[in-house]
Curated annotation (Swiss-Prot):
It comes from Schizosaccharomyces pombe (strain 972 / ATCC 24843) (Fission yeast). Signal peptide: none annotated. The keyword ATP-binding applies. One of its GO terms (molecular function) is proton-transporting ATPase activity, rotational mechanism. NCBIfam families: PRK04196.1, V-ATPase_V1_B. Keywords: ATP-binding, Hydrogen ion transport, Ion transport, Membrane, Nucleotide-binding, Phosphoprotein, Transport, Vacuole. This is V-type proton ATPase subunit B. Pfam families: ATP-synt_ab (PF00006), ATP-synt_ab_N (PF02874), ATP-synt_VA_C (PF22919). HAMAP family: ATP_synth_B_arch. The modification Phosphoserine is found at S491, S492, S502, S503. Gene3D superfamilies: 3.40.50.12240. Its main location: membrane.
Length: 503
């Protein structure tokens, strides 16, 4: 007869809850990543189950569907090696939870939330449901104040507010991984005079990074980049590799967002959550849907993909009574560069803008190849201006957009009629176009520009045009910044100014 000590030890190892668990040996069939169970008493939707294999290994799964005494379970580690007759199933009685702690910063976890950095086990401060807690819409606060990425084309023209969700639309072969790593290295709060010392302190900012379906080389790139540049101590990294079970990709972003919610709402940090690649997530969703033999929607994706994506994207934001915020930047690769594909199409409906990575700019050796014309930040107005960035930010952004669009039109006209037929204004626009792409959009992978350096650089480019052509900037702002003597030009000393100096 087993001793009381042995019984207690076994209970601790198996993590028994207060309610006794029920074990079953009633596996009916296996279909892809799904296990169909019969004769189950009171199964619960989203309940976590443990599968005990004949070789002694244990795999975890989640109840996807309940019909009477039947249950469909998706196995996170895959169903390879699962024996229909000899596998036993333990029902835990609760949904999937992740242990969270401030010690998660500087750690690396796999797609199931287990540490893979050879560090000690996490001493949990709390256990959170990975599906998150519903937020009362009335308690949400409108996103305000800017998160600085150090990239001029984002900070200057598509500013990101704390609590915003804005995706990066990329494609195969484009440097979205390098852009994501650069944002992680450089992102922070705007340094500005404030009475709230705690809110503006760099220790009050952290990053949660989740990679789904990446290859080993990409995973090593992210880890090495964070470690070498000293930003790793403020980053929590979740890695789901390409050779990991596809089904694991469905829970990886939810684990990352649960960690973000703990850091934002319990430790009151400003958290930037980066999710890459959401295309891999959607493909995993399609695989599960096909295994369940559901009626497919557009291009084989499930009809509920819009709802499913919203359960991820809508977890960004700010909550009344908490100083923290969750800002979300999901990255997705558009199949065949098609922005009408269901994944970017549905993502654009849910999120608050987009940042567009352009193949033509990439082919012209411009990094980061962000095309600002199709890019948009819908909450930019609330993140910029006097007291948050600078009083000229909004007007400068509008003028840059206008002149860049005119320059693109002039370039198209030049290819048809030749440069000799262009007007003086068109030639100035062409000059601006070249310098804007080579000096403003283009910057080094390790070049971190503050928002003030970005605005100064923008003014040095706008001085290519006579003052009367800058029709989108009020006279008061022009008086303050147009003349060289009243502008800060440290960041723009390498830009040639072809206009005479204003008096």
């Amino acid at each position: 007869m087993a001793s009381l000590f042995d019984i207690n030890a076994a209970a601790a190892v198996k993590d028994y809850s207060i309610k006794p668990r029920l074990s079953y040996n009633t596996v009916n069939s296996i279909t892809g990543p799904l296990v169909i169970l019969d004769n189950i008493r009171r199964p619960q939707y989203n309940e976590i189950v443990n599968l005990n294999l004949p070789d002694g290994s244990v795999r975890s799964g989640q109840v996807l569907e309940v019909a009477g005494h039947k249950a469909i379970v998706q196995v996170f580690e895959g169903t390879s090696g699962v024996d229909v007759r000899k596998t036993t199933i333990d029902f835990t009685g609760h949904s999937m939870r992740i242990p969270v702690s401030e010690d998660m910063l500087g750690r690396v976890f796999n797609g199931s939330g287990l540490p893979i950095d050879k560090g000690p086990n996490l001493l949990a401060e709390d256990y959170l449901d990975i599906n998150g807690s519903p937020i009362n819409p009335y308690a949400r606060i409108y996103p305000e104040e800017m998160i600085q990425t150090g990239i001029s084309s984002i900070d200057g023209l598509n500013s990101i507010a704390r609590g915003q969700k804005i995706p990066i639309f990329s494609a195969a072969g484009l440097p979205h991984n390098e852009i994501a790593a650069q944002i992680c290295r450089q992102a922070g709060l705007v340094k500005r005079p404030t009475k709230d010392v705690h809110d503006g302190h760099e220790d009050n900012f952290s990053i949660v990074f989740a990679a789904m379906g990446v290859n080993l080389e990409t995973a090593r790139f992210f880890q090495r980049d964070f470690e070498e540049n000293g930003s790793f101590e403020r980053v929590t990294l979740f890695l789901n590799l390409a050779n990991d079970p596809t089904i694991e990709r469905i829970i990886t972003p939810r684990l990352a967002l649960s960690a973000s919610e703990f850091l934002a709402y319990q430790t009151e940090k400003h958290v930037l959550t980066i999710l890459t690649d959401m295309t891999s997530y959607a493909d995993a969703l399609r695989e599960v849907s096909a295994a369940r033999e559901e009626v497919p929607g557009r291009r084989g994706y499930p009809g509920y993909m819009y709802t499913d994506l919203s359960t991820i994207y809508e977890r960004a934001g700010r909550v009344e009574g908490r100083n923290g915020s969750i800002t979300q930047i999901p990255i997705l690769t558009m199949p065949n560069d098609d922005i009408t594909h269901p994944i970017p199409d549905l993502t654009g409906y849910i999120t608050e803008g987009q940042i567009f990575v352009d193949r033509q700019l990439h082919n012209n050796a411009i990094y980061p190849p962000i095309n600002v014309l199709p890019s948009l930040s819908r909450l930019m107005k609330s993140a910029i201006g006097e007291g948050m960035t600078r009083n000229d930010h909004g007007d400068v952004s509008n003028q840059l957009y206008a002149m860049y669009a005119i320059g693109r039109d002039a370039a198209s006209m030049k290819s048809v009629v030749g440069e000799e037929a262009l007007s003086q204004e068109d030639r100035l626009a062409l000059e601006f176009l070249g310098k804007f792409e080579k000096t403003f959009i283009s910057q080094g992978a390790y070049e971190n520009r503050t928002i003030f350096e970005t605005l100064d650089l923008a003014w040095s480019l706008l001085r290519i045009f006579p003052r009367e052509m800058l029709t989108r900037i009020p006279k008061k702002i022009l008086d303050q910044y147009y003349s060289r003597s009243s502008a800060y030009t440290e960041s723009s000393k390498d830009v040639i100014d072809n206009t005479p100096e204003s008096s």
